[in-house]
């Protein structure tokens, strides 16, 4: 404690003291800390995160929740011996990356955010994964840990290559930097080829598990992996065109995307618990949260039944969408994907109603004022990637922003019927 001791204050006086926490390696000495300088540095960092990507709506709870989420994902960046990296944090996960959290969830967000350390962290994450590409097409590990020096792959192939290709291609387009995109392309290309080699006789992608790593059944081929692969092919075709790659390469990805989309509807499309939606895997006969994911990648053929199922009492709870109908477990990531997908599908008022309920519970409830990881596992850790997903509900869902090139995008704003205006300002994307 600096400037500690007994202070006698008269009315109007003040006293300042600082509590300092430091961790140093064995043999190193503690740093001399200037609390005022550290405080000023913190304020400057927060301002640099908050000055871009500003949401303005008639709903102050949504505006505030967006700002909190933006801060949470932007501040969870750490200096490692292999560069800046975004990690989940939450008092648990540091100096490490995951194919879902960093490659799939936060990477695309940082493409829009205009926050320099975030852009650097996303680029570094994809670079860490690229170090595990190989000529035999063995799967890239699910997680790179220990400051980029080791890995974890305890759940086998979770569909990680689809996650990486999806996120890296979206980030490359939104970031708008041709040189960075060129560096990412070998990783994207490799991951797409890996997924292609995993396509089974039914035309969908096999994997050992999914991002829940066996906590719930996922079969030998799940809806998430094939949907992410489809979206990655769509983005890759845009990236090829923007980068000036041969037209036949672009066309090949477009054909593959069309084929996997058809296979998704054919193989996974089913009536589950009375709803015309999707089965998560072949043997699945219980509604699952991840039936939402086709909506987030522009597959709308079964949107009516899917949206009805998502917001039915079988899946929707006070904390968002249950992982499986009838179970108390929830993971915020699937709720945030669902809300984004319902906005994208054009059911704006339904999406807003449930987004408002969710946002009020997270911002003003009894826990941290951010999206969380899960319950009961981890007791709702405030991991940073979920905050990135929350922001993407607005950027890609409510405002319908989709990169199609380094300087081009499609946009389809979904203005709720009760609002007269909404704004997403200070977007720093596309170079």
Residues of each region from the PLM?
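Substrate-binding cleft and catalytic face of glycoside hydrolase catalytic domains
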Residues: 169, 189, 198
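Gly/Pro-rich turn-and-neighbor structural signature
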Residues: 55-68, 250-272
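Terminal accessory carbohydrate-recognition/targeting modules of carbohydrate-active enzymes
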Residues: 1-61, 115, 347-351, 355, ...
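Substrate-binding groove/exosite segments of carbohydrate-active enzymes
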Residues: 47-182, 209, 283-296, 310, ...
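Helix-capping and short linker residues that terminate individual alpha-solenoid repeat units
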Residues: 130, 134, 176, 196, ...
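Active-site core of glycosidic bond-cleaving carbohydrate-active enzymes
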Residues: 98-127, 182, 186-193, 214, ...
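Proline-centered turn/helix-capping motifs that create local helix->coil transitions or kinks
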Residues: 77-80, 133-138, 196-206, 266-273, ...
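The feature captures the catalytic groove of carbohydrate-active enzymes
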Residues: 2-35, 91-95, 141-163, 193-258, ...
């Amino acid at each position: 404690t600096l400037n500690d001791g007994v202070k006698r204050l008269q009315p109007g006086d003040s006293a300042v003291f600082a509590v300092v926490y430091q961790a140093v390696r064995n043999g190193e000495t503690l740093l001399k800390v200037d609390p005022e300088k550290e405080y000023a540095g913190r304020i400057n960092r927060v301002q640099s995160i908050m000055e871009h990507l500003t949401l303005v709506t008639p709903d102050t709870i949504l505006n505030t929740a967006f700002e909190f989420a933006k801060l949470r994902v932007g501040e969870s960046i750490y200096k490692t011996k292999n560069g800046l990296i975004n990690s989940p944090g939450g008092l648990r996960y540091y100096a490490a990356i995951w194919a879902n959290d960093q490659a799939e969830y936060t990477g695309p967000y940082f493409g829009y955010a205009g926050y320099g350390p975030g852009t650097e962290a996303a680029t570094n994450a994809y670079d860490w994964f690229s170090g595990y590409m190989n000529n035999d097409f063995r799967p890239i590990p699910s997680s790179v840990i220990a400051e980029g020096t080791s890995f974890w792959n305890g759940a086998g192939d979770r569909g990680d290559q689809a996650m990486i290709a999806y996120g890296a291609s979206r980030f490359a387009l939104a970031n708008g930097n041709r040189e960075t995109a060129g560096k990412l392309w070998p990783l994207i290309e490799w991951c797409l080829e890996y997924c292609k080699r995993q396509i089974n006789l039914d035309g969908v992608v096999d994997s050992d598990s999914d991002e829940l790593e066996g906590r719930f059944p996922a079969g030998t081929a799940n809806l998430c992996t094939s949907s992410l692969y489809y979206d990655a092919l769509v983005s890759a075709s845009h990236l090829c065109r923007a980068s000036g790659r041969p037209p036949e390469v672009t066309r090949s990805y477009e054909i593959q995307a069309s084929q996997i989309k058809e296979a998704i509807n054919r193989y996974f499309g089913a009536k589950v618990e009375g709803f015309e939606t999707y089965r998560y895997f072949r043997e699945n006969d219980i509604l699952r949260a991840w039936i939402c994911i086709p909506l987030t990648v522009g597959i709308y053929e079964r949107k009516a039944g899917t949206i009805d199922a998502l917001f039915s009492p079988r899946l929707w709870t006070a904390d968002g969408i249950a992982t499986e109908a009838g179970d108390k477990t929830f993971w915020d990531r699937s709720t945030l994907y669902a809300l984004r997908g319902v906005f994208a599908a054009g059911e704006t008022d339904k999406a807003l109603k449930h987004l408002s309920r969710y946002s009020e519970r997270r911002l003003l409830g009894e826990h941290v004022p951010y999206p969380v990881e899960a319950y009961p596992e981890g007791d709702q850790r405030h991991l940073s990637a979920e905050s990135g997903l929350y922001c993407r509900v607005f950027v890609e869902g409510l405002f319908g922003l989709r990169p199609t090139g380094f300087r081009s995008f499609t946009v389809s704003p979904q203005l709720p019927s009760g609002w007269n205006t909404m704004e997403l300002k200070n977007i720093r994307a596309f170079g």
